[in-house]
């Protein structure tokens, strides 16, 4: 759903995350904004400030789009996408497709996480971390039956005792990334 419209005094733009060029607001891209309520930078940390802004606009790290009525829809975090063969592949969407296809229950906590790891041929490759027993063949079959593009099907599955989470209950992206990297090394 929508997170609403921009507050009065705020301006936003949608950028192509690769080129940082402005694209139509109704296309999915990197959300940036500026306004009187946006901070000016990190205290005594000009390098971090430089990375957080683009030409005076704050870089949210969110991928989103606006509808015709000006409502903003956040569709993911840039850090939760992989670029594979030039295409942006959303980890959260793949995770939800796997949960739906296999009718997995995550009411007691995470049972899976999709992560991107470097791949010399395609840029990145997808690794599925899961607490459940699942084969690549089963995964591929179910996702293709659900009309998920082949490019979005994780090629590596790593069974883990638990999906790394933070004290807040959110995915520990660093822990998941480390586990995904380790899966390729083993």
Label every model-predicted segment.
Residues 170-186:
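Phosphopantetheine-dependent thiolation modules in NRPS/PKS and related acyl-activating systems
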Residues 35, 40-41, 63-152, 175-178:
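AMP-binding/adenylate-forming catalytic core of the ANL superfamily
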Residues 22-24, 67, 73, 166, ...:
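Generic structural signal for well-ordered beta-strand positions
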Residues 23-27, 76, 123-124, 170:
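Short glycine/proline-enriched turns and hinge-like loops at secondary-structure junctions
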Residues 1-69, 78-81, 94-97:
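Conserved AMP-binding/adenylate-forming
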Residues 124, 148-171:
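AMP-binding/adenylate-forming catalytic domain of the ANL superfamily
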Residues 17-19, 68, 121, 161, ...:
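Short, ordered coil/turn segments that flank beta-strands lining enzyme active or ligand-binding pockets
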Residues 12, 111-114, 156-157:
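Generic structural signal for residues in well-ordered beta-strands
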